[in-house]
């Protein structure tokens, strides 16, 4: 039995989380809260979710011993949780399956979503196609340009992709537009948020659907090695892949937990040069919950930067804010340059192309492995595959595709 029982009934992780939304959204949020409370322990719902994870998404994903990388570093032994091998290419499908099944039970016929890197958009469009639901995806104009492959995939799946031209034209603005849509179409629309942000119950619900990552990794490590790993590493934008890995280990205090944010051009260059609210932000309210965010003294959101579209978000899930303050997890930041280097290292040494988001975790995992001895072990969450980033990397490095 876990000693960790957050959030409370009102969605609070101590002083973080909660429900901070306009009155016009209250009905929809409380309808969702009641529905999730009703179905999350329902045996038929759980069975259908687990069967879809197995037979549709392709779970369980492997825990792969990165022998070549471990040997090269001469430090800790590195294991990769291969979420990149899921159907659609990332961890995002775990959550979209769960929320789409809930939407069907609530009688909703239309699905909306926001997306940055496009992986959540693809995963949402995928489950919507399978369940016969209308699908609309909001995506920042900047992200549409740098993730054109995923835009095409969403359209092939039958989704309508709406470029968002307001603000920084990235993930934050996509989430804003999706919420505006939801307000106007409450009766027939279900909003599938892709990360552990938003008002309660989203941070809890998305965590619960993603927690399969850590449950599997814990059992797999025990079977392959015995005992527990010494450390966990995962990238953090909103933070769903990270909490998916971390959650099963929170009570295991011998396991060190590291979340890795996007340092972009460098933390020292100011808030517009990175996307690292836990490392260099302050506390405020964003997208319906209290958390760490990138904001100025007047409470205005500062637009940040990351080479990875999925990390380019000015806030973070409230559970990560709590884990930071409580000291249970530590949060680091990796620059664009370091992430690119890690991308090439893993690709050339292990034959695995990680997403640029995941490359941030790989980069810090490499640093950590060098500090630890050979008798130590690290699990790195490889949250997605890097096919979507090939053109971005080629453009940066001046390579013709």
From Swiss-Prot:
Record bears the keyword Glycoprotein: no
GO CC, one annotated term: cytoplasm
Protein's UniProt keywords contain Lipid metabolism: no
Sites bearing N6-(pyridoxal phosphate)lysine, chain numbering: 92
Pathway: Amino-acid biosynthesis; L-tryptophan biosynthesis; L-tryptophan from chorismate: step 5/5
Reaction catalyzed: (1S,2R)-1-C-(indol-3-yl)glycerol 3-phosphate + L-serine = D-glyceraldehyde 3-phosphate + L-tryptophan + H2O
Gene Ontology terms, MF aspect: tryptophan synthase activity
Similarity annotation: Belongs to the TrpB family.
Name of protein: Tryptophan synthase beta chain
Organism, scientific name: Vesicomyosocius okutanii subsp. Calyptogena okutanii (strain HA)
